[in-house]
């Protein structure tokens, strides 16, 4: 049985988070992505940094985490992007069925008509 998973990635701009979200859904690596504005405080290069970031949460399955990680690592503007995942322990049957209908374990983008 597929394990539902939520992948979290932070971005410096809303635009970069939206671009990645669209690509993850287009590639069928995620059923849906949500973007929220957040304030992050972290230690980076010997300094404490406080800045506005945009958190992308991708709804997917654990089997697709590696594909998402590879995509993000290859396209992200940060030197060390946050790419974390958490298993969803509870979700409605209908939501899981919908998620399953939206993703593709091969990670291949669907053929689209022009």
From Swiss-Prot:
- Organism, scientific name: Encephalitozoon cuniculi (strain GB-M1) (Microsporidian parasite)
- Subunit structure and binding partners: Homotrimer.
**The name this protein goes by in its record:** Probable divalent-cation tolerance protein cutA homolog
What Pfam family is a match, any one? CutA1
Which SUPFAM superfamilies did the record assign?
A: GlnB-like (SSF54913)
Q: Which residues cross the membrane?
A: none
Q: Please give a single GO biological process term from the UniProt record.
A: response to metal ion
Any GO MF annotation of the entry: copper ion binding
Q: Gene3D superfamilies from the xrefs? A: 3.30.70.120
PANTHER family, per database record: DIVALENT CATION TOLERANCE CUTA-RELATED, FI09726P
Q: Report the family membership.
A: Belongs to the CutA family.
Which top-level group of life is the source organism from?
Eukaryota
């Amino acid at each position: 049985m597929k394990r539902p998973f939520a992948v979290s990635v932070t971005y410096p701009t809303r635009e970069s988070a939206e671009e990645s979200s669209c690509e993850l859904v287009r590639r069928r690596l995620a059923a849906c992505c949500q973007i929220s504005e957040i304030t992050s405080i972290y230690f980076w290069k010997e300094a404490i940094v406080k800045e506005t970031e945009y958190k992308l949460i991708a709804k997917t399955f654990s089997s697709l985490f590696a594909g998402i990680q590879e995509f993000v690592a290859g396209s992200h503007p940060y030197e060390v992007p946050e790419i974390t995942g958490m298993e969803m322990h509870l979700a409605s049957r209908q939501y899981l069925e919908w998620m399953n209908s939206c993703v593709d374990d091969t990670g291949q983008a669907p053929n689209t008509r022009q």
